[in-house]
């Protein structure tokens, strides 16, 4: 039996600590090769209005910067030009409660990423207006932990009680 290489499948840019926690949970429990990126490990939130600063930062600015940072991404070559495979994705998970309607539309439609080299790989995921609302609408139980006046974090994927006979 031959081993196949396990390439990085996606990069997820997270709004804040709760989104990072959710992505880390998925990465760990489903054992998916993804890189979870956030500002200061989720301590500082990324807004719709500032996401381009991240994409124009040292990790994402150019294709070369990207493949230098994320060395285990699968690259295909056509003649002399290098590309990421069509299976690779950059997911950007952000709240839409901190921007105006035009910025929100530009994020959701990908218009704000049009001139970035990674445009074809970017897939915006938006919480309308924030993650709490989405979890509530989806009937996903969570606990809100207030850290201080303007900051809180969510604890979700709470264990559910076992039904008799299940282990």
Question: Model-found features: residue ranges?
Answer:
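C-terminal accessory helical subdomains adjacent to catalytic cores in phosphodiester-
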Residues: 1-11, 20-41, 45-167
